[in-house]
Amino acid sequence: MNMNADPAELQKFSELAHRWWDTTSEFKPLHEINPLRLDWIDRNAGLAGKRVLDIGCGGGILSESMAAAGAHVTGIDLSEKALGVARLHLFESGQKVDYHHASAEEFAAQHAGEFDIVTCMEMLEHVPDPASTVAACAQLVRPGGQVFFSTINRNFKAYLFAVLGAEYILKLLPRGTHDYVKFIRPSELARYCRQAGLETAELLGMSYNPLTQVYSLGNDTDVNYLVHAKQAVS
């Protein structure tokens, strides 16, 4: 199996797995940004009736919401514990998602070109080789299909907000959630996309206002940002 995974990262998220669906837990930020992510993906690609792959699906927060929007969703992750939580939650939600224990690279070798939409959200900054994951996304999506990424920029402001602010001051996330050296500049992600044969269609920022405790999408890509890419039609 081509893992492209950091064992320490897997251990970290596996230990928290039972809290994925607790909206007051460490995963509260994911629950709060999920409507923004879902609306952005649906607005750009139209989820209803589409075959969608959610890479790094974790406990299934985004996967389930895309299924509820009418997509045929497959979710993959390398944390068995997170997948166990995701599968269990389907009994509660009544949604249908097909979950698999696999890396993006391994799944791409078996399912190339099978998906209309591939999502890879809040995941690239946790793998040793993000370019390999982007290349796998490009393999998995059909010609003319669409890929959606979200990750964190690498600069002083990002360190200040995403590490010091989120983990130490506001305590939105557990300490050690992010490793600054793994953050990815938009120019780097754009290069990974080009190398994989993907065209970048949109770059958008996501910001958090600590006073109102509200997340919003906009032009500020200094910290969190999203990228919409398209596979060329062959």
Curated annotation (Swiss-Prot):
<dbReference type="GO" id="GO:0061542">
    <property type="term" value="F:3-demethylubiquinol 3-O-methyltransferase activity"/>
</dbReference>
<keyword id="KW-0949">S-adenosyl-L-methionine</keyword>
<dbReference type="GO" id="GO:0102208">
    <property type="term" value="F:2-polyprenyl-6-hydroxyphenol methylase activity"/>
</dbReference>
<keyword id="KW-0831">Ubiquinone biosynthesis</keyword>
<dbReference type="Pfam" id="PF13489">
    <property type="entry name" value="Methyltransf_23"/>
</dbReference>
<dbReference type="InterPro" id="IPR029063">
    <property type="entry name" value="SAM-dependent_MTases_sf"/>
</dbReference>
<feature type="binding site">
    <location>
        <position position="37"/>
    </location>
    <ligand>
        <name>S-adenosyl-L-methionine</name>
    </ligand>
</feature>
<keyword id="KW-0808">Transferase</keyword>
<keyword id="KW-0489">Methyltransferase</keyword>
<feature type="binding site">
    <location>
        <position position="121"/>
    </location>
    <ligand>
        <name>S-adenosyl-L-methionine</name>
    </ligand>
</feature>
<comment type="similarity">
    <text>Belongs to the methyltransferase superfamily. UbiG/COQ3 family.</text>
</comment>
<feature type="binding site">
    <location>
        <position position="77"/>
    </location>
    <ligand>
        <name>S-adenosyl-L-methionine</name>
    </ligand>
</feature>
<comment type="function">
    <text>O-methyltransferase that catalyzes the 2 O-methylation steps in the ubiquinone biosynthetic pathway.</text>
</comment>
<dbReference type="GO" id="GO:0010420">
    <property type="term" value="F:polyprenyldihydroxybenzoate methyltransferase activity"/>
</dbReference>
<feature type="binding site">
    <location>
        <position position="56"/>
    </location>
    <ligand>
        <name>S-adenosyl-L-methionine</name>
    </ligand>
</feature>
<protein>
    <recommendedName>
        <fullName>Ubiquinone biosynthesis O-methyltransferase</fullName>
        <ecNumber>2.1.1.222</ecNumber>
        <ecNumber>2.1.1.64</ecNumber>
    </recommendedName>
</protein>
<dbReference type="InterPro" id="IPR010233">
    <property type="entry name" value="UbiG_MeTrfase"/>
</dbReference>
<dbReference type="GO" id="GO:0032259">
    <property type="term" value="P:methylation"/>
</dbReference>
<comment type="pathway">
    <text>Cofactor biosynthesis; ubiquinone biosynthesis.</text>
</comment>
